[in-house]
Amino acid sequence: MTHLFTHINQDGKANMVDVTDKNTTQRQAIAQAYVEMKAETLALILNGQHHKGDVFATARIAGIMAAKKTSDIIPLCHPLALTKVEVELVAEPEFNRVRIQSLCKLSGKTGVEMEALTAASVAALTIYDMCKAIQKDMVITQVKLLEKTGGKSGHFTSQ
């Protein structure tokens, strides 16, 4: 089976996909990321003792803002009128990590996978930024698309 990259034209050059003739559909994407850290770092966050303030609130807002700016930082993404962005952060002390899950929605001609991935990634980067003075060896891991609905390609769920 031949797979063609949609962002490469017949001359092999990168270009933005033309979505003019695509149908407008309800679209949704859910992405995740994890930030692994020492138990002591996670405890500071959860106990509200971090000297920079509320880490989860800051990461949540950063993720939401990033989703809205995705087309500004990823060159071939279309600017989208997102109708919903959620970023949820859940501490998993049994694994010494924070799980981040983002949800993006819209009614449009192109998907919101990149926006959901950007939201989760930037929320994770924000946690790292706020905690790097305490711990520099945190690990951002498992950034991936969990699910997407809508559009010509239909429903996708990560295995």
UniProtKB/Swiss-Prot annotation:
Positions of substrate binding: L76, C77, H78, M114, E115
Q: Which UniProt keywords apply?
A: Lyase, Molybdenum cofactor biosynthesis
What are its E.C. numbers?
4.6.1.17
Q: Do the record's keywords include Nucleus?
A: no
Question: Which GO molecular function annotation, any one, does this entry have?
Answer: cyclic pyranopterin monophosphate synthase activity
Family matches, as Pfam families: MoaC
Pathway(s) the chain acts in? Cofactor biosynthesis; molybdopterin biosynthesis
Active-site residue numbers: D129
What SUPFAM superfamilies would the database entry show?
Molybdenum cofactor biosynthesis protein C, MoaC
Lyase listed as a keyword:
yes
Kind of enzyme, top EC level? lyase
Q: Which GO terms are recorded in the biological process aspect for this UniProt protein?
A: Mo-molybdopterin cofactor biosynthetic process
Reactions performed catalytically: (8S)-3',8-cyclo-7,8-dihydroguanosine 5'-triphosphate = cyclic pyranopterin phosphate + diphosphate
**What the protein does?**
Catalyzes the conversion of (8S)-3',8-cyclo-7,8-dihydroguanosine 5'-triphosphate to cyclic pyranopterin monophosphate (cPMP).
Q: Which family does it belong to?
A: Belongs to the MoaC family.
Against HAMAP family, the record matches this protein to: MoaC_B (MF_01224_B)
Q: How does it assemble?
A: Homohexamer; trimer of dimers.
What name appears for this protein in its UniProt entry?
Cyclic pyranopterin monophosphate synthase
The source organism is Psychromonas ingrahamii (strain DSM 17664 / CCUG 51855 / 37)
